[in-house]
């Protein structure tokens, strides 16, 4: 092998995500989130201690739960309209609208420009879990 091939192989080893490591990361994330919510087979998110979470944590937890529910095929889409988020959390839509825009500015939540639905940025999943599980 020449130097270029060795360099390419080294870069590949550093950047190529191994399924086992990704799965292990997701297992650790699931362990942390299991103290906050559970997911019914219908895809509904059931909070363990709803009153201990602020609105940002509730929205992030709900959207993260929907991410996993969609990943496992329990629901068709992880994306939610703000009215559906407000209904699921029993909070005023206007209150949550301001908060979700703030989460978007932090890069934790994205909004689909075609239909206005919100979803978590899965590349920030570790940051999102840290935000959800931080002590108030």
Predicted features and spans:
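Minor-groove-contacting beta-hairpin "wing" of winged helix-turn-helix DNA-binding domains
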Residues: 79, 115-121
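Short, amphipathic alpha-helical interaction segments positioned at domain boundaries
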Residues: 125-136
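Short helix-coil-helix linker/hinge
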Residues: 52-56
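Short helix->loop/beta-hairpin flanking segments within DNA-binding domains
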Residues: 58-78
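A short alpha-helical element within helix-turn-helix/winged-helix DNA-binding domains
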Residues: 77-87
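A short, conserved structural fragment
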Residues: 104-114
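Short amphipathic alpha-helical interaction segments
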Residues: 89-105
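Long, low-complexity, charged/polar intrinsically disordered regions in eukaryotic proteins
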Residues: 1-51
